A protein has these predicted regions:
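Metal-dependent nuclease catalytic regions and adjoining charged, substrate-binding loops involved
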Residues: 64, 68-69, 74-75, 122-198
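Short histidine-centered catalytic/ligand-binding loop motif
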Residues: 98-106, 145-149
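Metal-dependent nuclease catalytic cores that hydrolyze phosphodiester bonds in DNA/RNA
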Residues: 1-94, 101, 194-198
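Alpha-helical structural motif
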Residues: 7, 15-19, 112, 151-158
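Structural motif
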Residues: 4-15, 108, 171-178
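Short, histidine-centered active-site or binding-site loop motifs used for metal coordination
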Residues: 97-101, 135-138
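Short, charged, amphipathic alpha-helix that recurs within catalytic cores of restriction-modification
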Residues: 108-120
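Short glycine/proline-enriched turns and hinge-like loops at secondary-structure junctions
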Residues: 77, 107-108
Length: 198
C-alpha cells in the first residue's frame, strides 16, 4: 500500500508523457510552473471563476453548486480537486475549465474527467454521468462529455500505470514527439533534449 496519495494531476501528466511520472514523483524534480505563462494563466482562470461564479449554473441546470472541493479515495490512494460541479438530486455534473483554444477531448482530459468522476461518486455517493468542459482563451466553447465505462476503465488503467512507475522507480521508455518541445523537463530528458537542442 502506498503511503502517499497519487493525484489526478499526476495521472494526467503520466498520460501526457510517462517520463513525467519518473521525473516528478520518482526523482522529485520541480516543474517550476511559475515560469510557464500558459500554466499561470490557467490557474488565474480557475481562481477567477472560483471567486466570481459561485452561484452561476451553466445550461440552466438546477442544483447545488460545488466549487474548488478536494476529494480523496483511500481505496485507490488517489486525490483530486474539482473546478466546479453541480449536485442534483440524483447525480453530479462535473465542470472543467481549460485555458486553451484547442478543444479536442483527448486522452489527458478523459483521464481527468474519469478519475474526478470516480472520486465524486465515492465521496458524494452519486454518479457522474455528464461533464461539461469549458475552453476559454480567445473564445469560449462548451463541450458536453458523457462519462461511460470506457472512460472510467481507461482512467483507472492510467492510474495503475502511474503507480507502477512510482513504486518500481524505473524510467519508462518514450518516443520523441512535438510535445517534447514545450516540456518542462526537456533539458534533462534523454529523449527531449536530443531533439530540441537544449
Amino acid at each position: 500500500m502506498m503511503d502517499d496519495f497519487i493525484t489526478v494531476t499526476d495521472v494526467v501528466e503520466n498520460t501526457f508523457c510517462e517520463k513525467f511520472t519518473y521525473f516528478s514523483l520518482v526523482l522529485g524534480l520541480k516543474q517550476y510552473e511559475e515560469k510557464r505563462g500558459v500554466v499561470i494563466s490557467g490557474k488565474d482562470l480557475h481562481i477567477k471563476h472560483e471567486k466570481t461564479n459561485k452561484t452561476y449554473l451553466p445550461l440552466n441546470i438546477e442544483g447545488k453548486k460545488i466549487i474548488g472541493m478536494k476529494f480523496f479515495s483511500k481505496r485507490l490512494s488517489l486525490s483530486g480537486k474539482i473546478d466546479e460541479a453541480i449536485e442534483t438530486d440524483d447525480e453530479v455534473i462535473l465542470i472543467e475549465r481549460k485555458y486553451t483554444d484547442y478543444t479536442d477531448i483527448g486522452n489527458t482530459i478523459k483521464v481527468q474527467l474519469g478519475l474526478l468522476s470516480i472520486l465524486i461518486n465515492e465521496n458524494l455517493k452519486k454518479p457522474v454521468n455528464t461533464t461539461i468542459v469549458i475552453f476559454s482563451k480567445k473564445h469560449t466553447i462548451k463541450k458536453i462529455v458523457p462519462i461511460d465505462q470506457e472512460i472510467l476503465n481507461f482512467a483507472l488503467n492510467r492510474l495503475e500505470y502511474t503507480k507502477n512507475i512510482f513504486l518500481s522507480c524505473l524510467n519508462p521508455t518514450q518516443q520523441y514527439s512535438n510535445k517534447c518541445i514545450n516540456c518542462c523537463y526537456r533539458k534533462i530528458c534523454p529523449v527531449g533534449s536530443l531533439y530540441t537542442g537544449l
